Amino acid sequence: PLAVLDLDSAGDERLGPYRDLKGRSEFGAEHFIVEGEHLVGRLLSSALEVVSVLVSSRKIDRVRPLLPASVPVFVLDDDEIENIVGFKFHRGVLGCGKRPEELGFDQLLGSGRPALKAVACPEITDSENLGSIMRTARCLGLNALILGERCTDAYSRRCIRVSMGAAFTLPVYRCGAVVSDLKKLCAAPGVQLVGAVADPEALPLSGIVPADDWCCLLYTS
């Protein structure tokens, strides 16, 4: 049976990951939060560990078919959820996932892997920009996202929302030193590094013959 828990109090400690979502730092946190029926459904169907789901009492009947028996489901009224998260919330459903173990750059070129089709973002500081890049990368069939040490968090609420949950299936690699790591990537046998620039003199994308292993380098804000 579905593990639906009608809570007596919005102060229940199990709701900790959902509290004050706007007022706290998400970077490197143990858990991440997703908003809305669509993204919660994608999270539940992914290979990531789902800690819990928080549902408005007006939405529980609608989303019940999405919810597996193995995941605790907390049900509260809208005003109680808004008090917990710290802002007006109309989507009615939130999910809490466990952040996957961060992949090191050295794992990127390991043995037994598929051909590398990656995008590298040395210093993307805007969550919506990174989310757009991730969504596009997933649509194009890329299989790796390389982030510089100063890049924003791929598991922030805003990034996940804009990416439409691309982080659930796109492996994310965090560099310790992006310049030296990308130099190592360039030096790896057969790897092609392509830099994307807004320049009318640049070689058009249609003129590039990609290698089996390649990485597109993006600089933006």
Region roles according to the model:
Residues D6-L7, F74-L76, P171-V178:
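Short acidic-hydrophobic, aromatic-tinged amphipathic segments that line or gate anion-handling sites
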Residues G95:
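Glycine-rich phosphate-binding loops that contact phosphosugars or nucleotide phosphates
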Residues P1-S57:
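Boundary-proximal intrinsically disordered activation/regulatory segments immediately upstream
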Residues H38, S45, F105-L203:
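RNA substrate-binding interface of SAM-dependent RNA methyltransferases
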Residues V75-K88:
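Glycine/small-residue-rich loop that forms an oxyanion/phosphate-binding "nest" at active or ligand-binding sites
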